[in-house]
Amino acid sequence: IYCIGPGTLAKNLESSVPAAKGFLANFWKAYPEIKRYVDNTISKGEKDGEVKTLFGRRLRVDRERPYVAVNYVVQGTAGDCMKISLYRAHKYLKENGGKIRNTVHDQMLFDDIDEKQIPEIHKIMENFSFSMPMSVDVLHSEKSWGDLVEV
């Protein structure tokens, strides 16, 4: 989906370019709706010089490199989800106690939350109306990073 070319794919898989071309051809054949989405997004980036996240945020695309448009939409939408989740979690914790200590890339770190709050925060972070569900991993520790356990 990130528009990797056969040369880069072959290198990453330590394979031959013809094998990578075959893999890509089979992938696009198996998932024509993804191929259509990729082609349309690249075309829009090239034609308009911009694309939009699923939330409508505009992202500029260099018309000389329109293939980046797909990744921009995917990563931009993920960033939007993170910002929305951060706002929702902050609002919830302000009303119910606890703090957001920090964010690291696509993670939120919390302090002073009750274990009973974890399921609600988990729900807040996954609550998006996409045709495909969003999954969020939740780890918890009372002491340190070394003691993290999946919830």
Enumerate the predicted regions with their spans.
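Conserved catalytic core of nucleotide polymerization and phosphodiester-bond processing enzymes
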Residues: 1-151
